[in-house]
């Protein structure tokens, strides 16, 4: 959620902007961590300030190991990666801008426009060209060489038997 900045949000959190982005984690373990933090500090608005676990232009990690592979060389002994298991949905998070009269989606993810309208009871605001993290063309560009093959015939024994039992 992108919200109007309060006086509690320091410049190093907001980059000096008049808004702040708040992540609402889907992980029950992370929600428990945040709830415990609020209890320990006796402050219902306690939060953890943290960057994304991927470099600019990279795909968001879906496991703790992916995060370590992506940013491990930048971690210090004071840094912590909470391994709560793999992400349930392997796509970028939805980003909703709530700084105007009506919410608007900056980046689609698991949460749909209909979900936002249902949760807020409001119709979404207009769309505009917005540059949000995770929408660059490079995010879903393969890093490996890709060979496009129009047609190939493989002998039966070359096709893994598990393909017929694959779940999509």
Show where each model-derived region lies.
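Active-site-adjacent structural elements in enzyme catalytic cores
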Residues: 1-165
